[in-house]
């Protein structure tokens, strides 16, 4: 199961996907 924590980076909402073991699966910035 992957968790999707949300963090603010430079005033933009950054979503990073983590594996259950805590390894980075994919990192990108939300751009709506």
Curated annotation (Swiss-Prot):
Keyword field: Secreted, Toxin
One term of GO molecular function: toxin activity
Tissue distribution of the protein: Expressed by the venom gland.
Name listed for the protein in its UniProt record: Hainantoxin F8-35.23
Source species, domain of life: Eukaryota
Principal subcellular localization: secreted
GO cellular component: extracellular region
Intracellular or extracellular location(s): Secreted
């Amino acid at each position: 199961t992957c968790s999707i924590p949300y963090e603010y980076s430079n005033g933009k909402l950054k979503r990073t996907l983590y594996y259950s073991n805590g390894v980075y699966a994919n990192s990108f910035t939300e751009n709506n």
